[in-house]
Curated annotation (Swiss-Prot):
InterPro entries the record matches: Band_41_domain, Ez/rad/moesin-like, FA, FERM/acyl-CoA-bd_prot_sf, FERM_2, FERM_central, FERM_CS, FERM_domain
GO molecular function terms attached to this record: cytoskeletal protein binding; protein domain specific binding
Chain spans, region Required for interaction with CRB1: 29-119
One GO biological process term: positive regulation of focal adhesion assembly
Domain FERM, chain residue ranges per copy: 43-327
Keywords: Cell junction, Cell membrane, Cytoplasm, Membrane, Phosphoprotein
Membrane as UniProt keyword: yes
Key word Phosphoprotein present: yes
GO CC term, one of those recorded: ruffle membrane
Compartments where located: Cytoplasm; Cell junction, Adherens junction; Cell membrane; Photoreceptor inner segment
The protein's name in its UniProt record: Band 4.1-like protein 5
Topological category with respect to the lipid bilayer: Peripheral membrane protein
Domain of life: Eukaryota
Length: 733
């Protein structure tokens, strides 16, 4: 009697305890669905949804799986429910899909409450066939979990794009004031998420501006469907050799993997038999041999547990029926009275064909997209490292510009400095004269030419039109074209000529000093292109190097030794006058460069005095008349041009304390005096710095002709004696 009461009271107490526990579980869940009705025996099922929320459902004790599934679909308001299923774990930790035809209590042994998970059961081969926006949203959530758990392998670039689509769908458009790269670290997209990937996701997110959440989710699915393992349901098996293999169920067939390598594919039409017994799965495949005859191949796989083997078999049957059949197989109502062999399981849901081909009215539904789980934000180290070089480069640029400006303004001083010129050289195209020997039109060169205009707009017109001429030989033209001079516009300061370039040029010109070759008559115009602006400048007869364009003089030449004695004496007188004039004698230039140079350049960039500039602009050349028939008339014209080319400074410069050596004039009786400008070009290069005391290099080709007598040598010597007290300056540029 006592045992009876103990048993009865004990059962009642157990029921009360179970009822209280059920109520606690229902209160813990976010949503509670009472679907048991008036049933006294109630079971509680707790379903975890894809968005992370939980739903608690009360059902009758003998309720089947389809009742629970319908309650969840009704709660979600989901129409395309055939792609989804409820999954649970058994005591052997084997995952199973809840069978809608069987009792929940018989399938799920662990409870109550019975815990299940809503998952995508069949991955659509074409996501665009999904009609409902809610269906696509749930697919995105499932794929996101597959990638995060490592079930679905994803390359780096694809993972970055998919993560950017997730951010666009959840956060909307990128906002510079609100979003920073550290924001990406609050989300988890892949198992191993590096800072490099987060920065790439952040940059990719900016490109998806303007996409709505629905558009971003559609793009996500269209990108994810091309993954190799998309929609593959993997099961680990063992073959006869004892090695581990993986069978992947896909819409097209069964894949066979050895590790990560795909070694085979069995198409559904080629599979004739698929059955199981205990933990062995038998697969019979028909293939054509070389002769075209069908041959059957039998494959046997083993699994660790019989329940896992049956689960694999059921999944294969469902995949074949869903993707290959037009409709589910109807179960026969006649049940055999004999002992049943094998399983009676058949797929009872709709196929993909029925789901996509059935005309359904599109409906406008509203649902709430729940935010993803957030994690603690971390500071990106790569961003700091990436911005430091940029800041450093910007700082360097600023310092370079400031230094360049200081150097540009510092060029006004007389101290010799050689900073790097910030502005690029302006290309000036100098066309070789067609009359120059050894040069053609294809020898045209575009050299960087820098013009110092000395902040005078009027000086440009006076200097460009002041010089004409051509090189005497190919070597001379090449040596002159190798001169690299820097360019500045008015008001920007005078650039400096590199010392090494001037030194090399001076040495080249000095080597060519002794070479004698005939010079042709100069051109009267030259094309000068400055700053890519084609401007044809016709040079006038006003120039520093006055050229007597006379047919008679072009034929008659002065011996080089005569001209050398006279000009050397003039040079010695110039060198000994003042230190300032000696600096001016350093100026390197040629006849071609003088067409564009506006002032004389020296190593220290000392500008010419204002008086000398005015004198340069007021100089008039000697009159070039007709052909001189008499030698005496020619000599008078030459001596007149010599005196006119001398620059007379109005202010007498300070004379150095050193004793002045009076030049010795040697005037032979059988020759004529010339300043080297009779029908040819004269190039004088002064190189006085750095131990070079040779004076001015002279290039004057021979012109063998004789003059009977010198008629005006006396007046010329007297005039030059008077000019000794003034600043003498030759016509060299």
């Amino acid at each position: 009697m006592l045992s009876f009461f103990r048993r009865t009271l004990g059962r009642r107490s157990m029921r009360k305890h179970a009822e209280k526990e059920r109520l606690r579980e229902a209160q813990r869940a976010a949503t509670h669905i009472p679907a048991a009705g008036d049933s006294k025996s109630i079971i509680t099922c707790r379903v975890s949804l894809l968005d992370g929320t939980d739903v608690s459902v009360d059902l009758p004790k003998k309720a089947k799986g389809q009742e629970l599934f319908d309650q969840i679909m009704y709660h979600l308001d989901l129409i395309e429910s055939d792609y989804f299923g409820l999954r649970f774990m058994d005591s052997a930790q084997v995952a199973h899909w809840l069978d809608g035809t069987k009792s929940i209590k018989k399938q799920v042994k662990i409870g109550s409450p019975y815990c299940l998970h809503l998952r995508v059961k069949f991955y659509s081969s074409e996501p665009n066939n999904l009609r409902e926006e809610l269906t696509r949203y749930l697919f995105v959530l499932q794929l996101k979990q597959d990638i995060l758990s490592g079930k679905l392998d994803c390359p780096f670039d694809t993972a970055v794009q998919l993560a950017a689509y997730n951010l666009q769908a959840e956060l909307g458009d990128y906002d510079l004031a609100e979003h920073s790269p550290e924001l990406v670290s609050e989300f988890r997209f892949v198992p191993i998420q590096t800072e490099e990937m987060e920065l790439a996701i952040f940059e990719k997110w900016k490109e998806y501006r303007g996409q709505t959440p629905a558009q971003a989710e559609t793009n996500y699915l269209n990108k994810a469907k091309w993954l190799e393992m998309y929609g593959v349901d993997m099961h680990v098996v063992k073959a006869r050799d004892g090695n581990d293999y993986s069978l992947g169920l896909t819409p097209t067939g069964v894949l066979v993997f050895e590790g990560d390598t795909k070694i085979g594919l069995f198409f559904w039409p080629k599979i004739t038999r698929l059955d199981f017994k205990k933990n062995k799965l038998t697969l019979v495949v028909v293939e054509d041999d070389d002769q075209g005859k069908e041959q059957e191949h039998t494959f046997v796989f083993r699994l660790d547990h019989p329940k896992a083997c049956k689960h694999l078999w059921k999944c294969a049957v469902e995949h074949h029926a869903f993707f290959r059949l037009r409709g589910p197989v109807q179960k026969s109502s006649h049940r055999s009275g004999f002992i049943r062999l094998g399983s009676r399981f058949r797929y009872s849901g709709k196929t993909e064909y029925q789901t996509t081909k059935t005309n359904k009215a599109r409906r406008s539904t509203s649902f709430e997209r729940r935010p993803s789980k957030r994690y603690s934000r971390r500071t990106l180290q790569m961003k700091a490292c990436a911005t430091k070089p940029e800041e450093l480069s910007v700082h360097n640029n600023v310092s370079t510009q400031s230094n360049g400006s200081q150097q540009a303004w510092g060029m006004r001083s007389a101290l010799p400095v050689s900073p790097s010129i910030s502005s690029a050289p302006v290309p000036v195209e100098i066309e070789n004269l067609p009359q120059s020997p050894g040069t053609d039109q294809h020898d045209r060169k575009c050299i960087p030419l820098n013009i110092d205009l000395l902040n005078s707009p009027d000086l440009l017109e006076a200097t460009i039109g002041d010089v004409i001429g051509a090189s005497d030989t190919m070597e001379t033209s090449q040596a002159l074209n190798d001169v690299n001079v820097a360019t500045r516009l008015p008001g920007l300061g005078e650039p400096e000529v590199e010392y090494e370039t001037l030194k090399d040029t001076s040495e080249k010109l000095k080597q060519l000093e002794m070479e004698n070759s005939p010079l042709l008559s100069p051109r009267s115009n030259i094309d000068v292109n400055i700053n890519s602006q084609e401007e044809v400048v016709k040079l006038t007869e006003k120039c520093l190097n006055n050229v007597i364009e006379s047919p008679g003089l072009n034929v008659m030449r002065v011996p080089p030794d005569f001209k050398s004695n006279i000009l050397k004496a003039q040079v010695e007188a110039v060198h000994k006058v003042t230190k300032e004039d000696s600096l001016l004698s350093h100026k390197n230039a040629n006849v071609q460069d003088a067409a564009t140079n506006s002032a004389v350049l020296n190593e220290n960039n000392v500008p010419l005095p204002k008086e000398s500039l005015e004198t340069l602009m007021l100089i008039t050349p000697a009159d070039s008349g007709s052909v001189l028939k008499e030698a005496t008339d020619e000599l008078d014209a030459l001596l007149a041009s010599l005196t006119e080319n001398l620059i007379d400074h109005t202010v007498a410069p300070q004379v150095s304390s050193t004793s002045m050596i009076t030049p010795r004039w040697i005037v032979p009786q059988s020759g004529a005096m010339s300043n080297g400008l009779a029908g040819c070009e004269m190039l004088l290069t002064g190189k006085e710095g750095h131990g070079n005391k040779d004076g001015i290099s002279l290039i004057s080709p021979p012109a063998p002709f004789l003059v009977d007598a010198v008629t005006s040598s006396g007046p010329i010597l007297a005039e030059e004696a008077v000019l000794k007290q003034k600043c003498l300056l030759t016509t060299e540029l």
